[in-house]
Design a protein with these regions (language model features):
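Acetyl-CoA-dependent GNAT
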Residues: 14-84, 90-94, 103, 168
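Short secondary-structure junctions
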Residues: 11, 130-131
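Conserved active-site tyrosine of GNAT-family acetyltransferases
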Residues: 123, 128
Length: 169
């Protein structure tokens, strides 16, 4: 059911063992079974996740995260939703923020690529600030870790850099 343009029928909860197949399929659809960031190959399914489940039981979104030592910081590793512009991504961000706050976390951060215009619109509207540009990071990852990274990304933008954003949880 829509209310004010947002889905109000998703439940956000920690990923459970029973979600593993659906989570794998969901990440595969979003080409995110493995990724590269900051010179490291990452496998999101190896990390904790929150899932957004629609009223019918289907996976509507998923956020994977990496808590730092003693929860001093928490990195959002992946965030994907089935349908954009319905509030599912915001619900997942707010849920990981609450989790991080309860753990005493001081920094919630995310890395995106320079072509991800949608993310660069989404995160600042949810309180994230751009803190760092890792120039050439995608080029280096393509050369040494993940050669299948395309040279041109979304909207025809050359894919070269990683952009780091953060907020307090």
């Amino acid at each position: 059911m829509l209310r004010g343009g947002y889905v109000d029928a998703v439940k956000v909860r920690p990923r459970e063992a029973a979600d593993q197949d659906a989570a794998r399929a969901f990440l595969a659809r979003h080409n995110s079974l493995r990724g590269a960031r900051l010179g490291e190959l990452v496998h999101p399914l190896d990390h904790p996740a929150l899932v957004a489940v629609a009223a019918g039981g289907q996976l509507a979104g998923m956020l994977t995260y990496v808590p730092g030592p003693d929860w001093q910081q928490c990195e959002i590793l992946t965030l994907h939703v089935g349908d954009q512009w319905r509030g599912t991504g915001t619900a997942l961000i707010e849920a990981v923020g609450r989790l991080a706050r309860r753990q005493g976390c001081g920094r919630l951060w995310v890395i995106t690529t320079n072509d991800n215009v949608d993310a660069l619109r989404f995160y600042p509207r949810r309180g994230f600030c751009l803190v760092r540009v890792h120039r050439g990071a995608v080029d280096r990852s393509r050369a040494s870790l993940k050669p299948e990274i395309p040279t041109v990304g979304a909207y025809g933008i050359p894919l070269r850099d990683e952009i780091e954003l953060e907020r307090q949880p």
